Amino acid sequence: EGTVEPTNLVRVDNNLSEEELKDGWQLLFDGKSMSGWNGTNSKKEPDGWEVADGLLSGFASGNVILTESVYDNFELEFEWKLKKGADGGLFFHVPSTLSLTEILNFGPEMQIIDDQYHPDAAVSNSHVTGAVYDILPPRYVISKPIGEFNHSRIVVSGNNIEHWLNGIKTLKYELNTDIWSQNFNNSLFRENSNFGKSQSGHIAIANQEGQLWLKNIRVRNFLGQ
C-alpha cells in the first residue's frame, strides 16, 4: 500500500472533471456560496465564515461549519492555508447540535495549525498539523509555509482512519485498539467515555484561532470494511 499520491494535475479551482464525477466525487464548495454548509444547529449563515475570491474563509476565531449531509465511510480532500499564528481542525461523525466546545471534546480532530508560529504546535508532536490532536502524532511534519496552500486528505473507513498531507500519508490509525486506548488514556480527553464512538454524522471544520482559507473541498462515500 503506497504512502505517496500521484502528482495532482492542474485543475480549475472548485470544479470537478467528468472523470472525478464518474468516480463518485461530490463538490462541497462551489467557490461562490456557503451552499452545503451550516453552522451549529443547522444555522444557514454560520457566524465567522464568508466566501470571497473563490475561497471559503473562517475569519473570526471560535467558529465552526458543518456539512449539510451526514457521512459514515468517506474520503475528503481539501486545500487550505492559514494566517500567521492560526489554529483550526477537522472533525467527523459530528451531530449538528453541538457547540464548538462540545465538538472539540466529541471525537478525533485532524489538527490544522501554524506549525512554525503557533505556540501550541511546540507543546507536543501530537499538536502539529496532521496529528490526531493530543492523541497521536503524524509521522512527518510537512505543512507548507504560511500563505501557501496545503492539500489535506482524510479517509474514514469504519474504525480505520488515514491522514494525508501534501501527497504523503502522515498517519494511519485504528479506533478502539490497544494502541489507541493507550494514547487516548494519556490525552486531554481521557475522561470522556463517548469520545470517538460515533459511526456517522457531519464533517466539521473549526476555526479555533486566527484565520484560515479553504478551496477545492470534495468528498466521496464508499462502502466501509
What are these regions (language model features)?
Residues E1-Q225:
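Carbohydrate-interacting regions of secretory-pathway proteins
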